[in-house]
Each structure stands twice: as C-alpha cells, then as structure tokens.
Amino acid sequence: MPEYNWPDPEHRTLIGRRTLRVDAPVKVSGQAKYTYDVKGPGLLFGKILACPYAHCKIVSIDTSAAEKMAGVKAVEILQKPGAQIHWAGDEVVALAAVDEGTADDAARAIKVKYEKLPHLVSDAEPPPGAAASQGPLSLDDVSDMLDNQVPEREMVSQIQQYGITAKPSEQDLKELKEDGAGAPVLDALQAAAVHPEAAGRPKSRYQKAAVVTMGEVDKAFAEAEVVSEGLYGAPVIVHCCLESHGTTSEWTDDDHLFVHVSTQGVSGIAGQMAEPLKLPASNIHVHQDHVGGGFGSKFSPDRWGIASARLSKKAGGKPVRIMLERARELEVAGCRPSAYARVKVAAKKDGTLVAWDSQSWGTGGPGGGGMPPIPYVFSIPNQRKQHTAISNNIGPARAWRAPNHPQAAVLTMCALDDLAAKLNMDPMEFFLKNLDLVSKQRQTTYAEEFPIAAEMMGWKDKWRPRGTNLSGNLARGVGLSIHTWGGRGHASDCDLSIYPDGSVEIRMGTQDIGTGTRTCIAVVAADALGLPADAIKLYVGDNQYPPSGGSGGSTTPGGVSSSTRRAVVDARDALFTKVAPALNAQAEDLEAVGGMVRLKSDPNRSLSWKEACAKIGAMPITAHGHNDQIASKNKPDLTNSGVGGVQMAEVEVDTDTGIVKVRKMVGVQDCGLVIDPRLAESSVMGGMIMGISYALYEEKVMDPTTGRMLNPNMEFYRLAGFNDIPELKVHMMTGKGYDERGVVGLGEPPVISPGAAISNAVANAIGVRVSFLPLTPDKVLSAWDSRQKAGA
C-alpha cells in the first residue's frame, strides 16, 4: 500500500518551512486577475436598481422608459409586484448597458411604487416582555426565508422542529424550487408535521429560540461563594471584503454559460445556478483566478449573479458584469449576527466555576439569530440559558469568519474575566484553574499554550488588579481569551500529471481566496517530488477540474493538502517503477530529493529529475487523489478536527478622550501539521488585525426612522489601519503531539478571541467593563465616568 502518511520531520524538505507564496509575483506585479478585471469583447455593464425602504411591498414596476434608452441592451425584473422587501438595498430590477453612465441613467428612469410597511432595525436593547415561542411555519414563511437567504441547514432545522401550517401542494413545491429551495428543504416540508390551527396566527419579531437547563442551577447559585453579573454584547457588523461581490456571465451558445465569479466555492456555483436558469449544471462553466476575500459571504451566486446570466441571455449572449459598489456591498452582501446577553456566573472562593445563567438575544436580520455557543469553551456544570431571536430589517445574515464564535467569546470570556476580578484572581490563573471544564482533547493544548503566551506578552510583569495601572490620563491593562474550532478537511479531489519533460501539473476545482491555497498545494506536491514549489504548475479556480469543497469552516487546508498528498504519492511511486530498472534498484528503495531520483542507501546512484522523467515514455503519468470529508478506517487520515488557541492583548486608554490603543497582541495557536509557517503566522496575524477592527471600530449603524444604514462607506465604516496595528507576536504549536494529527484548518480560529481579549484589557486598564463592542471613545468615557462617580 502506498505510504500516504505525512513524512517524518527528517524527511520533509518543504513542509514546515517558510516558502515564498507561489502567487506573490503576479500579485505584486499587478498581473493577478480578479472578476472586475474580466473585460471581454462587447462587455456590458450591469446595474441594480435597489429598494430604498427597509420593509415594504412592491406595488408596481415600470421599466418602459429604461428599455427605450439608446445603449440599454437588457432589463430584468428581479422581484415582481406583490413581493415583500425585507431590507433597504434589496434588488428589484437589473439592467445591462453599453457603459456605466448609460446604466446609471437607465436605472434612474425605472419607476417603482412601494407600499411601506413597519420596520425594525434595532437590536441592542433587551427584548420587551416575554418572547413568543416559535410557532409552525407557513409556506410564506418558507418563501421569506429563501428571500432572506437563510442557510438551508437552518431552514430544514426550523421546519423539522416547528412543523408547518399547511401541507404543500405539488404546485407549491414547484414554485419553492423555482425560488431556490433545495431538495433537503423540499423533503423536510413533505415530511413535516402539519398544524392547521396555527394558520393566520400573527408572528412576533421576538421569538424564544432556545431554552436550555443543565444541572441544579438555583441550588448552585445559592451555594456559590462569589457571583458576578454583567451585560455584554457585540453588534451586527459586515464582511468588508477587499474585492466586492460580483459576476461576469456570458453565453457561449444557446445552452452553455460561462461565469467568472468572485466565490468561495467554485465547484458548487453551477449547481446553484442550474435551477433558476433552467439549465443543466454541466452546461455552466464557472471560472475564477483570484478572489479578494470572502470571510463566509461568497458561497452563493446571489440574485445579482443570476441576473447577470439572464441579462446576458437577453443581450444575445454578450458578457454582462455586475459588481457591487462599496455602499451596496456594505448594505446587502451579508452581515455577522449580533449577540447580547445578561450573564450571571458563580464560583467557589478558590475560583472553581459552578454555575452559569444567561438571557441572550440577537439578530441576523429577517431570519432572526441563533443562540451563540455559550458558555464558550468551558462546560460549566450548572447552566440555564434562554435565547431570543429578533427578526428585523437590518439586512441578510451570512456566515462571518468563525460563525457565532467571536460573539460567544465576548459573552463568555468577558463574564469570566469579571468574575475573576471579583475573586481578585489573575484571569490566567483563573482560566488555568478551570481547564478541567474544557474538552479533554483541548486541556493539554491550553495548558501548554498559556505559559508560552504569558512569556511572549510579559504577562507576569504587566498584569495588575483592575484600574491600578494609571499614569496621568493614561491607563494600561492586559486581557486574554481562549477559543476553539473544528477545521477538518473537506472532500477534495486532485489530478496530478508528471510529463516526460519533467513538468508537473495539478488540477483541482478549489479556489484561492487570498489565504495561500495555491502555495499549500504546491508545497505538499513539491515536498514529495524533491522539487521547488514553483516547479509545480497549478490549475485551480475552475469547475471543469476535479471538484473540491468550498473555502469555509477552515476546511480547505486539510482537504486540498490531503488529496494532493495522495495523488503525488501515487504519481511518484509510478515514476519510481519506471525509473528503477535504470538504477538497477527496486522502486521501493528510491527517493526523490533535491531535484534527483536516487537510491536511499546510495545517493550517488541517481538520475536528475529530468533524466528520470525521460524514462516515463510517450504518455504522462497521471494520478488521482481524494480526501474524504469523513474519516475512513481503510486508509490513513491526513487531516483532523479540533484546535485551541490563546490570545492576549495589551492596551493603553486615554481617559480624557476615551481612545483605546492596542499596543501588543500575542497569539498561540495549534493547527496540527503546519504546511508553511509563514502562511500560518500570516493567518493568525490577519485574524488578530480583523479582531482589532471589530473590537474598536466596526458596527453597522442603522437609522431607526428610515431603516437605512448610516455608514455605508469606508470613511465611516472604519477598519483598523496601519497606525492601529500594534506589535503582533505569533507562536504555532508544532512538533510531537501536534504534527501527527495531520493538517487542521486555521482560517477561523485566530479571529475569535481578539474582541474578548481587548475588551478584557480595557476593563483591566480603566477598572470597569465597557459592556458592548465596539469600544468607541463615547462608550469608554461613559464607563470611566460611571466609575469616577461611584468613587472608585
């Protein structure tokens, strides 16, 4: 059986070493092509007419004036009269014109009448009164969930849990399918319990989404020696991809579509476009070269992607490009749900956690918002949790890097930090004290990571009790947080070819969204063949290549590296079989090292790589590698799941202005076998920088009167800039106990803890908790003033 296992450290030539990214030359030279750069002959410019209201019904649409304008080649009504709009900026009409000016003029010429409906865009206040229990779903509710882009898995869960008010007819199912309902949703509807008595019952915007009780909560609190109560929260924020969402579509003939799209899932887009376009998925060719980030928001072709294809069809097959302007990107391309909670948590005097009680709420837009996984990381023995999902009109929710985990970290780690302060304990000692409450898989990891992080931060010298490190108007403090994630590799297929001239090609239907996926694949292949990484010719970003999963859930590194490893080992072994007679050796006695194929026991008996490949014959060696999403007992598992990390932050707070400056952040992280330390460290640093943004600046600010976003631009929707980025130090956990686990994903974990760590550092600095992120000057000053008035 081929030796698919990852090589031991002494037999690795590239794996675990710092490698120049293989896409670096095209990026720094400006040659990298993104969706916006696709400019084929006859390119038409797509434009979306968006609804200005947060909640309304479309009464009428008149596109006649736009259709008559010179230069307008196609108009497509996306939502017909009678349709309900659930957020400002939702798409109503799309058009294509010969230039952007004409497209803008045509959009202004379209007349749409709306019936305004009541809207809600707030979510930070606790739900008024008792939340209603979720009732059975009507077919309109299901249709609304499709319009609101509620994830399929969540739709199925709600249908199964709550049932429906009426059994769907064949026509109902057909219409839902045309609206985008997948087979799991349709199957769930047909199997669901029917509750006709619930039909017509008015639905509350505040739905009791979860009530969980474990252990003897009241008894545990009554017997606890120390109890802390607090209010914590993180608002709705958006993805802010450097490259906005967009698609260029072109019909190559009447039945074949070519789509260039900015997506995190190139192999899955055709299947999503097939039903709306009434076209076999095999007739849709999806391609991309480079993607400027997605962070969970770019898995769907979206309404504008479907529109670009339909406009192209109406325009005689000419390419139509629709790219979201920055304002629309911030308004409608997805948001991270909010999460707020009143938390009461208790411990013994020695710091042993005994009880947790929380009333949480939040929104992900019209689809409501699920309960974040609280208490996070720690399985506190006695728990009571109630969550209220708020359905409002703030915009559509989408997965945001580590869905729900950053919010859970804020709610949990800040509550625990407050409890540690009440116990007069160093929070690191408090966390270490309770490591027996985390999963056994992670206990050793955290125990090893904490002292490393503390040494990097200088925690012992910098931590002081709350509010005691003051120098004039400057307060300094440190804070910490821990996090966990899965990250097992997704299903992935890889085709690898070795040619008689020595060239090596890999084809894989994955995508590189800026994370270094190309480099990861090249390093794994080159390591096994004894070649430099740039010797591998990589072809990715196309659904005509072997399928590979979407880049989400930190599943890509494990998936692509495992399928590549299997393919390259098979191809290398086939090459050894061809070469062995020339070296008077057995194939199993050969190795590929340093551009040579040689005898393991006698390196002088060798052929250069090109000489060895010349023995192949006329036809290339081809091999196929596959990684299973679920571990198989029949072959070695090259990927795994479950990581843990510790982050610490040091801040300086100006108590006159309320401005928070992060002075230093450290991150200690495991991810199994590290393919390239530079890529891994970059991912951790990127997560920490992203965390600084949502900790200090980011919030989707809404006008409660109009229901519109007030900061849909990069001037007022602020991200961390160069002057905001502090000293960043990263340590990757590698070696014995880590490498043998195989490759585990790293995209999500580093972004989970920064918000909580920075919030805890600010509380340590000024001696009082700022309840909600972002930690803006007004909130900091308000908290500081309350402390001063209390005589602290």
Predicted regions and their residues:
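Short, conserved non-catalytic motifs in the polymerase core
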Residues: 550-552, 556, 738-747
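General marker for long, soluble alpha-helical cores
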Residues: 132-198
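Glycine-rich active-site loop/lid that clamps phosphate-bearing ligands
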Residues: 608, 699-744
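Metal/cofactor-centered catalytic core regions of large enzymes
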Residues: 28, 634, 640-644, 667-721
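C-terminal substrate/ligand-recognition segments
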Residues: 653, 693-699, 746-771
